[in-house]
């Protein structure tokens, strides 16, 4: 089966090729891109389109690779032993299966998302090299070799917070999701707001890209933040006249708190709006 996009996700041709290439090579798809460009949603939509169950592992700064395999609950076993619980006779009762164990032992092919791998420490990717490459690992407590019944379709996302090791990169197919151009962005918006008035959308899009192109901006607004802003404009029934107001008492368009997340960026945008009004 090949991924050919979905009704809920605007996938470019090169992104669809990347998904299918990773499946052909039987390698994880490593997806990078700005926050909010749909990296996590890609795995969800591919899984739904290909009718695969999706297992998700969201990485934090404290996450260890072993947690993705399994954890042995020695404390509970010791407590149960002291209480004379019959469960202690079977060590399997104290093995907490991680997401890789679940994916490897699933009775049908699954999609596996390892989300924001760059949040973990630098050794995290290296600690998963063998397991992801060979699709197996050993559980020492139960003396079992856990081997994948069906090779999962693996998605790994990164926000580029830190560089990933070369040895890990060699085992992946890489794709960078570029920030959508205006035409692609309109298609994305149309999926979420099919009835949005063209004039309002055009004005909102101009404002959005004006903000993103501001020199010195600390945090550029993402696709997801544009969608949040449009949702608010629709919910509050903001008219085109209000959005394009020339009233000097109003320093910025309404509800830009969905786009700008610190006071320095708001100040920059206020200056841009002021200069645009002066030039009209």
Residue positions per predicted region:
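C-terminal regulatory/interaction module of P-loop NTP-utilizing enzymes
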Residues: 1-280
